Amino acid sequence: MPVKKQTPPAYIGFGMLTPVYIMSLDRLPKLNTGAIVHEVSDYVYDDAAIIACNLSQWGVPSAMIGTAVGEDMLGRHVATTLKKLGVQGKVRFTDQYKTPLEVNVSDKQGARTYFWQRTPQILGTLDTADLSLIKRSKLLYVDWYDGDHIVRAMEEAKKHNVPVFLNFEHGHTHNDLLKKYAELVTVCQAVTDAAQIGKKQAMLGTARKLIKAGIQTAIITMASQGCMVLQGEEIVRAYAPRVKTVDASGAGATFSSGYIYGYLQGWDMEQTVRFAIAAASLKVTRIGLEMFPVQEVLGVARTIRIERMVYRGDQFHVIRKFLRLPRLNPVINMNNALMKQGQKFAERILPKKKMDRRKIKKSLVE
């Protein structure tokens, strides 16, 4: 029987491969005490692998070029999980170390505490990984915390004119790293600081720093406060909807997944940002990383509050604010039946706004 040809991957993730156990509880216990775990789920981390798995669930051909895993039960679990989710790429095995394990603890306040194993020996296996999948792809994703091991992959992508998405987090505070990576990066996702507590001015300052370094698209994420994306003169500030948080682990990678999905679909920046925020917001409402269907994400995306600005003369200017997408937006009208279904889902999952009693009294008088 002839072997069925696979569609070349549009997305390539490059980085660590590790199984993870995610535990959901009410709040982290005090030192030397315990807590009841409500639910446990497992997945494949780190962020590059999360995104590959997420995009595969949305029907995007994806592949992973990762670190070697041990010849053990956990290593085989990683390979089996990736194959089951349709993620392409060869998983390499080694007898030099055991497969690393990550444990994430998520509480209802939206915090997540993680415990991971990342040794130079494990990360060093990235230096011998086969990069041949990159040249036929449409986007390469790398994480800054994998260190200089990512440079080889980024240079390979640049050689073949493949855009590079860098998850830089707070790495931009190291000017030497920013200078080194800027010429290789197309899209850069960052946070204002390690704790993500910066306000609007910090977001603007971080975006300005990345653009001035030569990066084409700067994404600044602010956890529950949403994000800001700057590309050329265009700026979109999106506010995350209020949702009941169950598990925040993987939310940042799910945002990246949503942004990359829109990018690969050829959507404009606002449509892409809406989808990314909606996907991340929905992800935290349940444990694990089973993605919501695209039409349901689009339903929530329509409700995202947006502020538009322009960047001219080294200054930021607000041009308009609105709550809903224009009626003629192609994302809304791509399939009326699906969009109606998505809107109903959004109405069900998002909290209803409370009516102001003062407005009620005024309307009765009028």
Model-flagged regions — what are they?
Residues 1-31, 41-43, 320:
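Positively charged, low-complexity intrinsically disordered leader regions
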Residues 2-12, 203-366:
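Conserved phosphate-binding/catalytic region of the ribokinase-like
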Residues 52-61, 262-265:
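Alpha-helix C-terminal capping segments
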Residues 122-130, 148-149, 167-176:
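Active-site glycine-rich loop that binds ribose-phosphate moieties when present
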Residues 135, 151-162:
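Glycosyltransferases and closely related glycan-assembly transferases
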